[in-house]
Curated annotation (Swiss-Prot):
UniProt-recorded name of the protein: Pentatricopeptide repeat-containing protein At5g62370
Entry-linked Gene3D superfamilies: Tetratricopeptide repeat domain
Cross-referenced PANTHER family: MEMBRANE-ASSOCIATED SALT-INDUCIBLE PROTEIN-LIKE, OS03G0201400 PROTEIN
Keyword Repeat: yes
Alphabetized NCBIfam families for the sequence: PPR (TIGR00756)
InterPro entries per record: Pentatricopeptide_rpt, PPR-containing_protein, TPR-like_helical_dom_sf
Spans of repeat PPR: 94-129, 130-164, 165-199, 200-234, 236-270, 271-305, 306-340, 341-376, 377-411, 412-446, 476-510, 511-545, 546-580, 581-615, 616-650, 651-685, 686-720, 721-755, 759-789, 793-827, 828-858, 860-894, 895-929, 930-964
Species of the source: Arabidopsis thaliana (Mouse-ear cress)
Length: 982
C-alpha cells in the first residue's frame, strides 16, 4: 500500500513534461529500469513501441498504447511506472491516459487516491476533463458512495453527446435501483441507449425486475427488445415471471394470460402460484367465467388444489353477491379433500353478514369443520358483531363482543372501529381504554391495572399503550391505531400526532391505519387545504401512503369540490405504479353527479374502463343515480340492464338502490319488476329499502302509506333501526312545521308495491289517529312509542328533541336533554341549534343568545345563521352585523338566506351604508341579492340622495344580469338620472 502511494505521488508533483525527442543515450538507462520491472516480453515490446511512436511524432498512437498498457496492468505500481516511463520519454499524457489511471486506481481499491490524482493532475493543471476522464470519475465516485456527484458526471457525458461506458452506466443505474428510483433508472437507461451505449446484462435484468415489481408496466415492456437482443434467445423464466406479475399487479389480466401462454410455448413450466395469481385478477375484475376456466384447466393438468385456489374463487363469487355459487365452490372444496382454513370462513361469514343473513353466518362460525380453529379469530368475530348490529340485533352484537373478550381473543383496530359505530358518541377514549386493556391482558399476558377513576383518561390510555409497547411492538402498533382513531374522532389531531411520535421513539412502526386517521382528521379541520400542504405533511410524518390513504384524500377533495386535485391524485398514483381503485373513481363520479356535471361523470366512468378497472356494483349504482338525479332516465335504464346482465344475480344492495330509485323517479311499475326479481333470487327486502321508501312517501305527504310500510317492517320481522326511526320522525316534524297542510300526492301503482312486500301475515292495522298526524298530541304519542322501542343514539335524541320543540314542549325538550346527558351522551352543535331555533320561534331571543354563548362547541355556519336570522327577526340589526363580523373572522361566511335576511333588516332600519357593504360582500362571493331587496335598497339610497352608492349597486345588478323590478323601475331611473355626477 505504501509503495503504491509513493509511486502515485510522483504523478501528483507538478512537473512539466517535454515534448521534444530525447537523445538515444538517455533511453537505455531509463528503459532498463523499466524493463527490469516489466512483467514479460509483451509489456517490453509495448514500451518499446511507445518510444518508437513518440520518436516518429505519432503521439496520439503512442498515447493509445499507453492507455492500453495501463488498462492491462495487474497492479497500481505497474500502471504508475508505465505512465512515468511515458512522461520521461517526452510523451505528455492525455485525457484518455488520465482516465485509464483513475479507473485503474479505483479498480485496485484506491478511489480516494484516484480522486486526489484527478483534482491535482487534471483539474489542478487546468485540463478540461473529457468523456473518458468523466467516465472513470463516475466509477470512482460511486465507489466513494458519492452518488449524486457520480450522477452529475454521467449527465455531463450524455449532455456533451458522448456515449458513457457500460461500466459507468450500469453502476449509476444499479445505485438508482438500490434506492428504488426505478423510473429515474429507466430514464437513464433510455439516455444511454440513445447515445449508442447500454448496460450490462445483469443490470438490465435488475432494472427490468424492479420496474415489474413496482408496477411500471410500460417502461418494463420498453426494455423487452433490448433484453431479447442481448440474450438472443427466449427470456429467462425469472424475467417472464417478473413481467407476468407486473401485468397482474396493474390489472392487465388478458395480457398476463397471453404472456402465460407464450411461456408455455417456449417450453417453460407455469406453476400453480402463477395460475392462482391470474385467477385472482380475473376475480378482481368480476370475470368469474375466465376464473373458472383457469380452475378447470388446473384440474385437467392434475395440479394439487389448495385452500388458496378455492378461497380465491369463493371470494370472487361472494363479492358479486352470488352466494349460492360460492357455497357450491365451498362444497367442491370439501369434496376434493381440501381443508378449509380461517380465511375460507372469514370470506363466507363476512359475505353472509353483508347480505344480512347473519344467522347463517353464525351457524357457519359455530359448526366449522376446517383445519383451523376459527372460534379464536378476531376477524370472524368482528364481522358477526357488525352484522348483528346492522340488522338491529344490538344485544346480540354486544354479547358476541363480550364473549370474544372473555375468551381471551385479542381485539384489533377494526374491532374498535366497529365499536365506535355501535356505541354512543363522545366516549371514544373510554372505549379505546377497554380495547387496550384487552390487548394487554389477552395479547401480552399482563393483568391490566384496575382503573376506577376515569379522570384524565388520556394519561391512563397513554400509560396502557406504553405497557403494550414494552411487551410487543406489533400489538403496540394495533393499540396505537386504536388510540389515534379515538383522538381523531374527537378532532384532536395534535394529541394523535404526539402519540405517533412517542411510539416511533419507542421502536414501534405505526400501521397505515394510524396515519390515515390523522390525514382524514387534518382534512376535516382544514389543516390540509391543497395538494402541496398534503405532500408537506406526508413528508413530515415520514410514511408511504397506501391505496386507502389515496382514497381518503380523493374523498375529502371531492367533498371540497376540488376534482382537479382529485384527478391529480390518480395521475400521481399511476406514476408511482399504483393502480387507482374502483372506489377512488366512484368517489369522483359521485361528486360530479351531485354537481350536475353528467358529461364529466361519463368521461370519468369511461376513463375507469379504459384503465382496465371493472366497475363494481357501487360504481354502477353511483352512475345510475347520477343519470336519474339529472333527468337522464333512458341512460339510467340502459345501465340498469347492463348491471343485471353483468352481475348475473345482483346483490341486495343493488336491488335496494334500483327499487328505491325507480320509485323516487315515479316509475313504480319498473320498481315492482325489480322487487319481483329480488324475491325470485331469494333475497328479502331489508331495513334500508323500507327506510328509503318510507322517506320517499313522507316527502310526498302520504303519511298513511308511510306508516303502513313502517308497520309492515315489524310484521316481516325486520327490526327498525335508528335511521328508520329518524326518517319517520323527521317526516312528521316537517309536516308539523308547515303552515298549510300539504296535499297528498297519490302515486299509481303503490298498492302493487305493497302487495309484493306483504309476505304471509295480514296487513298491519293503521292507527286511527293517523289522519291527525300534524297534531301535537300525535307527535307526543309517536315520541313515547319510539323511546320505548329503541335505545336512541345522539342523532335520534336530536330528532326527538326536534319533535318536542315542534310541539311547543320546550320544557320536555330540556328534560330529554338532561336525561340524555345522564346517559353519557354529549349534545353536539345540532342539539343546541335545534333548541336555539325553538327559542327564537317562541319569541325568546335572549335564551337563544345565552345558549349560543354558553355552548362549548365551536359554532358552524348553521348555528351562526340560525342566530343571525333570529336577530334580524327581532329587529336587532347592529347585533346581527356584529355576529356576521364574528362569523367572518372565524372563516365562515353567511349563506344566501342569511345575507338576504340581514339585508332586509338593514333596509327596514334605514342603515343603508351597512346594507351597501353587505351587497358588496355578497357580490364578492358571487352571491346576488334577490331583485326585490336590491331594488328596495337602491330606492332608499335615491331617496337619501346617495346617488353614488345607488349607481354602484345598479352596476352590480347589471353585472349579475338582472334588472330592477318593473313596478319601480321608471321612478328609480328618473331619480338616478337627476344627477349625472358619480
Amino acid at each position: 500500500m505504501l509503495k503504491a502511494k509513493a509511486l502515485c505521488y510522483r504523478f501528483f508533483k507538478s512537473r512539466k513534461a517535454t515534448t521534444c525527442a530525447l537523445s538515444s543515450e538517455l533511453f537505455p538507462s531509463t528503459s532498463a529500469a523499466v524493463f527490469s520491472a516489466a512483467s514479460g516480453d509483451h509489456r517490453s515490446r509495448c514500451l518499446s513501441l511507445i518510444v518508437k511512436l513518440g520518436r516518429r511524432g505519432l503521439l496520439d498512437s503512442a498515447r493509445e498504447v499507453i492507455r492500453r498498457v495501463i488498462d492491462g496492468s495487474s497492479s497500481i505500481s505497474e500502471a504508475a511506472l508505465v505512465a512515468d516511463f511515458a512522461v520521461d520519454n517526452g510523451i505528455e499524457l492525455d485525457s484518455s491516459c488520465y482516465g485509464a489511471l483513475i479507473r485503474k486506481l479505483t479498480e485496485m481499491g484506491q478511489p480516494g487516491v484516484a480522486e486526489t490524482f484527478y483534482n491535482q493532475r487534471v483539474i489542478g493543471n487546468g485540463i478540461v476533463p473529457d468523456s473518458s476522464v468523466l467516465d472513470s470519475m463516475v466509477f470512482c465516485l460511486v465507489k466513494l458512495r458519492r452518488f449524486d456527484e457520480a450522477r452529475a458526471h454521467l449527465d455531463r457525458i450524455i449532455a456533451s453527446g458522448y456515449a458513457p461506458s457500460r461500466n459507468s452506466s450500469s453502476l449509476v443505474v444499479d445505485e438508482l435501483c438500490n434506492q428504488d428510483r426505478f423510473l429515474e433508472a429507466f430514464h437513464c437507461f433510455e439516455q444511454v441507449k440513445e447515445r449508442g451505449s447500454g448496460l450490462w446484462l445483469w443490470c438490465c435484468k435488475r432494472l427490468f425486475k424492479g420496474l415489474c415489481g413496482h408496477g411500471h408496466l410500460n417502461e418494463a415492456i420498453g426494455m423487452l427488445d433490448t433484453l431479447c437482443g442481448m440474450t438472443r434467445m427466449p427470456l429467462p423464466v425469472n424475467l417472464y415471471k417478473s413481467l407476468f406479475y407486473c401485468f397482474c399487479k396493474r390489472g392487465c389480466a388478458a395480457e398476463a394470460e397471453a404472456l402465460f401462454d407464450h411461456m408455455e410455448v417456449d417450453g417453460y413450466y407455469v406453476d400453480k402460484v402463477m395460475y392462482t395469481c391470474l385467477m385472482k385478477e380475473y376475480c378482481k375484475d368480476n370475470n368469474m367465467t375466465m376464473a373458472m376456466r383457469l380452475y378447470l384447466r388446473m384440474v385437467e393438468r392434475s395440479f394439487e388444489l389448495d385452500p388458496c385456489i378455492f378461497n380465491t374463487l369463493i371470494h370472487g363469487f361472494m363479492k358479486l353477491g352470488m352466494l349460492d355459487k360460492g357455497r357450491v365452490m365451498f362444497s367442491q372444496m370439501i369434496k376434493k379433500g381440501v381443508q378449509s382454513n380461517v380465511f375460507t370462513y372469514h370470506i363466507m361469514i363476512g359475505s353472509y353478514c353483508k347480505e344480512g343473513n347473519v344467522d347463517y353466518a353464525l351457524r357457519l362460525f359455530v359448526n366449522n369443520t376446517g383445519s383451523e380453529d376459527i372460534s379464536r379469530n378476531v376477524h370472524c368475530y368482528t364481522n358477526l358483531i357488525f352484522g348483528f348490529y346492522k340488522k338491529g340485533g344490538m344485544d346480540k352484537a354486544v354479547d358476541l363482543l363480550m364473549r370474544m373478550l372473555d375468551n381471551g381473543i385479542v381485539p384489533d383496530h377494526i374491532t374498535y372501529f366497529v365499536l365506535l359505530k355501535m356505541l354512543p358518541k363522545c366516549h371514544e377514549l373510554k372505549y379505546a381504554m377497554v380495547i387496550l386493556q384487552s390487548i394487554l391482558d389477552n395479547g401480552c399476558g399482563i393483568n391490566p391495572p384496575v382503573i376506577d377513576d376515569l379522570g384524565n383518561i388520556e394519561v391512563k390510555v397513554e400509560s396502557l399503550l406504553g405497557e403494550i409497547a414494552r411487551k410487543d411492538a406489533n400489538l403496540a402498533a394495533v393499540g396505537l391505531a386504536v388510540v389515534t382513531t379515538a383522538l381523531c374522532s374527537q378532532r384532536n389531531y395534535i394529541a394523535a400526532l404526539s402519540r405517533i411520535e412517542k411510539m416511533v421513539n419507542l421502536g414501534c412502526t405505526p400501521l397505515p391505519f394510524s396515519y390515515n386517521s390523522v390525514i382524514k382528521c387534518l382534512f376535516q379541520e382544514n389543516i390540509i387545504e391543497d395538494l402541496a400542504s398534503l405532500v408537506n405533511i406526508i413528508q413530515e410524518l415520514d410514511f408511504v401512503p397506501d391505496v386507502d390513504t389515496y382514497l381518503i384524500v380523493v374523498n375529502e377533495l371531492c367533498k371540497k369540490n376540488d376534482r382537479d386535485a382529485a384527478f391529480a391524485i390518480i395521475d400521481a398514483m399511476e406514476e408511482l405504479g399504483l393502480r387507482p381503485t374502483v372506489a377512488i373513481y366512484s368517489s369522483i363520479i359521485g361528486s360530479l353527479g351531485k354537481q350536475g356535471r353528467v358529461v364529466e361523470a361519463e368521461e370519468t366512468f369511461a376513463k375507469m374502463l379504459e384503465s382496465g378497472i371493472q366497475p363494481d356494483e357501487i360504481a354502477y349504482m353511483i352512475m345510475i343515480n347520477t343519470y336519474a338525479r339529472n333527468g337522464r332516465i333512458d341512460e339510467a335504464n340502459e345501465l340498469v340492464e347492463e348491471v343485471v346482465k353483468h352481475f348475473l344475480r345482483p346483490s341486495s344492495f343493488t336491488y335496494t338502490v334500483l327499487i328505491s330509485g325507480f320509485v323516487k323517479m315515479g316509475m313504480m311499475e319498473k320498481g315492482c319488476q325489480y322487487l319481483d326479481k329480488m324475491l325470485e333470487d331469494g333475497l328479502s327486502p331489508n331495513v334500508v329499502l323500507y327506510t328509503a321508501l318510507i322517506g320517499h312517501f313522507l316527502k310526498k305527504g302520504d303519511f298513511k302509506f308511510s306508516f303502513t310500510l313502517f308497520g309492515l317492517m315489524g310484521e316481516n320481522d325486520i327490526k327498525h333501526d335508528h335511521i328508520a326511526y329518524i326518517t319517520l320522525l323527521s317526516g312528521l316534524w316537517r309536516a308539523m312545521a308547515r303552515k298549510k297542510k300539504r296535499q297528498v300526492i297519490v302515486e299509481p301503482g303503490k298498492e302493487k308495491l305493497l302487495q309484493r312486500l306483504i309476505r304471509t301475515k295480514p296487513l298491519v292495522s293503521i292507527p286511527s289517529s293517523l289522519g291527525n298526524y300534524g297534531s301535537k298530541s300525535f307527535a307526543m304519542e309517536v315520541i313515547g312509542k319510539v323511546k320505548k322501542s329503541i335505545i336512541p343514539n345522539l342523532y335520534l335524541h336530536n330528532t326527538i328533541i326536534t319533535g318536542y320543540c315542534a310541539a311547543g314542549r320546550l320544557d320536555e325538550a330540556y328534560n330529554h336533554l338532561e336525561s340524555m346527558q345522564k346517559e353519557g351522551i354529549v349534545p353536539n352543535l345540532v342539539t343546541y341549534t335545534i333548541l336555539m331555533k325553538s327559542h327564537i320561534e317562541a319569541g325568546d331571543i335572549e335564551s337563544a343568545i345565552d345558549l349560543f354563548e354558553g355552548t362549548n362547541c365551536e359554532p358552524d355556519q348553521v348555528m351562526y345563521s340560525t342566530l343571525l336570522k333570529g336577530l334580524c327577526d327581532f329587529k336587532r340589526p347592529l347585533d346581527a352585523l356584529a355576529l356576521m363580523l364574528e362569523m367572518q373572522k372565524s372563516g365562515i361566511n353567511p349563506n344566501k338566506d342569511s345575507y338576504e335576511k340581514l339585508l332586509q333588516c338593514l333596509c327596514y332600519s334605514r342603515l343603508t351604508m351597512e346594507a351597501v357593504k353587505v351587497v358588496k360582500d355578497m357580490a364578492a362571493l358571487d352571491i346576488w341579492p334577490r331583485s326585490i331587496n336590491h331594488t328596495w335598497l337602491i330606492y332608499i339610497l335615491c331617496e337619501e340622495k346617495k346617488l353614488r352608492e345607488a349607481r354602484a349597486l345598479f352596476a352590480i345588478m347589471v353585472q349579475s344580469g338582472r334588472s330592477l323590478l318593473n313596478c319601480t323601475k321608471p321612478g328609480l331611473l328618473k331619480m338616478l338620472n337627476q344627477n349625472q355626477q358619480l
